[in-house]
Amino acid sequence: MKYLVLGLIATSLVTLTACTDKKETTPIGTNTPTEMIQEKPAEAVDFTELLGHYDHMTFALSSDNVEETAKAATGMLAALQKIEGAHFDAEQKNTYQDIAANIKENAEHIEDNIGDIAHQREHFVEISTDIYDLVQLFDISKPYYKVFCPMVNGGEGAFWLSSAKDFRNPYMGEKMLSCGSIQEELN
């Protein structure tokens, strides 16, 4: 019995000593450096060039200038290509790709229809919706104003974005240059 008690005490001491050993162990598969598993934060995407061409298009349409409108469309297409490589998070990337595809399609129509300002203006309605979505979804530092003209689209009206409170109507051009009202201030 004496040996049994001594054996139990010895076993207990060995067990206690083994349990207090502060050896650091790393489970299998978790030795990846922290920097590698952290997601890279999405960087602010610079839409300055794209928005500059949109402003150019707005001014050209308000001046009834089909050639300058087409040049602005060409500039928008080039700006879209530069943005493609930007760092977006997964949700932003999907949203941006949808918006960019719409802008591209409509800018190509505007670019290809130099002699038809009515057709250019029809596609400008769509581009304005997409630019509005971009300004809403992404951090755009420049203020914009959503301006509505009730006279467009057979009386349905349409909006565009203006970078200034003193806007020029791209839908009516020289006929009704100041037609419209600011509905919303963005940023």
Give the positions of each predicted feature.
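Positively charged n-region of N-terminal signal peptides that target proteins for export
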Residues: 1-4
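Sec-dependent N-terminal signal peptides
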Residues: 6-12
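C-terminal motif of bacterial Sec signal peptides marking the signal peptidase cleavage site
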Residues: 15-18
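Short, low-complexity, disordered segments immediately C-terminal to signal peptides
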Residues: 20-38
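Mature extracytoplasmic or organellar-lumen-exposed domains after removal of signal/transit peptides
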Residues: 43-187
